[in-house]
Amino acid sequence: MTQLQVKLHEKQREVFDDPRRFRIVAAGRRFGKSRLAAWLLLIEALQSTSKDVFYVAPTFQQAKDIMWGVLKDLGKDVISSAHENTSVLTLVNGRKIYLKGADRPDTLRGVGLHFLVIDEYADIKPNVWEQILRPALADVQGKALFIGTPKGRNHFYELYKYAEKGTDEDWKEFHYSSYDNPLIPESEIEAAKTSMSSFAFRQEFLASFQAASRDIFKEDWIEYGDEDEEPKDGRYYIAVDLAGFVAVDKEA
């Protein structure tokens, strides 16, 4: 059988080599999540003896836009057929890689899976995993990879924190910023930083779960006083945005 020459940078390799059944990767933009997922989809499909694999994005069109070209490029030596309309790849061992959209949940039902990638899980309803995809892994103890950039403290965050606790040996979390991709010039990331709010930058490039999309102010717009300097006589005002606090956010 043709041997695939897997090429990954150091941080991608950490995830690729980890043996845990369920891996969660929260990473900044352009880290290389899609390429990592593509290699794992190909390898897992080639190793499967009975079941196929899924790549699931928030929509079918996103799945095709993100993954179709990458898979065909990396897997050209092991792909026997490619069906453009349905976005299904058949490999030389007969196993198939299906590209799916979570917005069409009925197309995800009725199959058993050897391996599964869920991309941008923060943008996918949690019941798609809990009620449809998780049961599909049960009969052959299939594996899953979750990848995405955080979108506040939602179900992606909760699943990440569950893995982070370390109480379930089947789960492992990984956190990377865009700086962890050695193929992206640091100067390019710094250039993007100058035109973004500090909160947006933290979310998109540093993969911060705390950077909610409603936060629009850049940190360097705020001038802090000397904490050791006593205030002068006069009238002072304070404004508090309670929506910015985690406890209030959870109760809202």
Predicted regions and their residues:
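ASCE P-loop NTPase helicase motor core
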Residues: 123-196
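A short beta-strand-to-loop transition that corresponds to the Sensor-1 phosphate-sensing loop
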Residues: 29, 59, 101-103, 147-152, ...
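Walker B catalytic acidic pair
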Residues: 119-121, 242
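ATPase catalytic-site recognition across NTP-hydrolyzing enzymes
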Residues: 181-247
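Conserved P-loop
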Residues: 20-88, 157
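Residues immediately C-terminal
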Residues: 62, 123-124, 245
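Inter-Walker segment of RecA-like/P-loop motor cores
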Residues: 60-114, 202, 209
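Pre-P-loop entry segment of helicase/translocase ATPase cores
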Residues: 1-22
